[in-house]
Design a protein with these regions (language model features):
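An N-terminal structural lobe/cap that precedes and organizes the functional/catalytic core
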Residues: 2-63, 78-80
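Acidic, carboxylate-rich catalytic segments that either coordinate divalent cations
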Residues: 4, 198, 204-219, 224-229, ...
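Accessory "access/gating" subregions that flank catalytic or transport cores
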Residues: 6, 11, 111-119, 130-138, ...
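Gly/Ser-rich oxyanion-binding loop with an adjacent helix/lid
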Residues: 65-161, 253
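Long beta-sheet-rich domains in secretory-pathway and surface-associated proteins
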Residues: 357-462
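Short, non-ligating residues that shape and space the ligands of small metal-coordination modules
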Residues: 475-478
Length: 487
């Protein structure tokens, strides 16, 4: 079978332009984030002297380190561990609630959805580029990694489908340039009835039926708009509008950002995609010169040495991508890009994405002895007194005979080799440990919450922040100490 061969020089150029476009689009949109009305930008306003610090890029630098340390296919718990080390101070929306659940002992993917109002937001769709570059020309593999990433803080929500969509689109864009083909590649990876997919299709319908851009924008806002400006559903429609209605790099970015809402994210995502499609030559100097190529890190991203420039980020990304390709039979790097006749059929393959999105998000996953151990809660990770709760265990995706130790006063009635009914007639403590033991694996602890730790959280509210540094109270970055944790 002929391979998809990607030319090394062209690939390096596209990766560079991807990251540069990310910085440009994010910097364009950053001053206007949260404005839920149409704008009229035709350039940066204000004109910057450097790139804006942006979690859209920063969090992918954490994944860069992870991939360099752990290899191209880290298990889900490793992603969670790296976030907890290097990005735990972020308090915003879904980020804060993932870390709130993590600190209570829960593990993803259930830690990414339990009591998390923000699973439908943009925090994970903006992290797609690292997976697209890692799996250039292999959309389903990029989408599979995007599922893992988004399971941290958007498990089962629209943000998950958004990241899977963009990872696939961007991965395919290294070898295909037709917007409609790319959009349908992305849609092939996500559920048909997801609201993100509906918003994207509505944007396409508007363009194909000749609606003026202003009318198209109002149509998306009217049918998919949300109280939260960072909700993924309208923002995906707006990004597609900018792409399809714009004439060139700058015009497309401005048209997307001018739709309002989560403007730094729509701008950054579209900027990345346009960078992949057009390479450095497609980015006019007037857009590049104000920000240069230095990477400006947000203070909440800390504890490791990130790339200092887009050039360094490009070289490190390319090295990872070439290493990942060595294990593939259908993707290779060479002197020039060469595509097989059935390239479109290959781009639309979605087996890995379908398998990924079919996974249970009501489970916690740990790694022990190189094995993935999952405790399936069958819903919320909570035991209430007097109510039996069936849980089950999977090891590397399969049921195996395990033992389950539970707290004093609980019972664990065995229903099968790996299935148990938990019960407590007495009041249940706020945080409880159950321990899975299996031959060749060892003992793996998981947390089950009691009703006192599962009282909910007001929809739309954020976790507590330090009044000085604005970080999560539990991960305050104030120098010299701070009293915020005692309040």
């Amino acid at each position: 079978m002929d391979r998809i061969v990607i030319g090394r020089k062209a690939f390096r150029d596209k990766v560079f332009a991807c990251w540069l476009g990310k910085n440009i689009g994010g910097t364009l949109g950053a001053p206007h984030e949260g404005k839920r009305f149409a704008l009229a930008l035709d350039f940066y306003d204000p004109v910057p002297t450097k790139a804006a610090a942006n979690d859209d890029l920063d969090l992918q630098l954490v994944w860069l380190k992870l991939l360099e340390d752990e290899g191209a296919d880290p298990p889900l718990p490793r992603l969670a561990e790296y976030w907890s080390r290097y990005a735990c101070s972020y308090p915003w929306n879904e980020y804060g609630f993932f870390m709130r659940n993590w600190s209570r002992g829960l593990r993803p993917p259930v830690a990414g959805c339990f009591e998390n109002y923000f699973v439908d937001e943009m925090g994970s769709p903006i992290r797609s580029e690292i997976w697209a570059c890692l799996h250039a020309g292999d959309p389903q593999a990029a989408s599979r990694m995007a599922w893992k990433d988004s399971a941290l803080d958007h498990a089962g929500g629209e943000g998950m489908w958004g990241e899977m969509f963009w990872a696939a689109v961007e991965a395919a864009a290294f070898v295909e340039s037709d917007p409609m083909v790319l959009i349908h590649v992305g849609l092939a990876m996500i559920p048909l009835a997801s609201h993100v997919a509906r918003s994207i299709r509505e944007a396409v319908w508007c363009r194909e039926n000749g609606l003026p851009l202003g009318d198209a924008r109002e149509r998306i806002a009217g049918r998919f708009g949300h109280l939260q400006p960072c909700n993924a559903v309208p923002n995906h429609g707006f990004t597609i509008l900018g792409w399809l209605y714009g004439k060139d790099f700058g015009d497309r970015l401005c048209k997307a950002v001018n739709c309002g809402y989560d403007t730094d994210c729509t701008g950054a995502t579209l900027g990345s995609l346009l960078g992949i499609l057009g390479g450095p030559a497609g980015i006019p100097a007037k857009w590049r010169e104000p920000i240069g190529t230095a990477i400006v890190l947000h203070p909440f991203t800390r504890g490791f040495k990130p790339p200092a420039t887009i050039e360094e980020l490009t070289e490190r990304t390319v090295a990872l991508s070439e290493k990942a390709a060595t294990g593939k039979h259908e993707i290779a790097f060479g002197a020039k890009t060469r595509l097989p006749e059935d390239v479109l059929t290959r781009l639309f393959r979605n087996d890995l994405a379908v398998t990924a999105r079919g996974q249970d998000v009501h489970m916690g996953v740990e790694v022990c002895g190189g094995r993935e151990v999952a405790l399936h809660y069958g819903g919320e990770p909570v035991l209430r007194p007097g109510i039996g709760r069936t849980v089950w265990v999977m090891i590397d995706g399969r049921e195996a005979h395990v033992e389950l130790a539970v707290p004093a006063g609980w019972t664990a009635e065995r229903l099968g080799p790996a299935r148990f009914r938990l019960f407590s007639a007495e009041p249940v403590a706020d945080r409880n440990q159950v321990t899975v033991t299996a031959p060749g694996v060892g003992a793996v602890p998981f947390t089950v919450l009691g009703p006192g730790e599962a009282k909910g959280f007001p929809a739309g509210d954020n976790v507590a922040k330090c009044p000085k540094c604005q970080a999560r109270v539990e991960a305050c970055i104030c120098e010299g100490g701070c009293s915020c944790r005692a309040k």
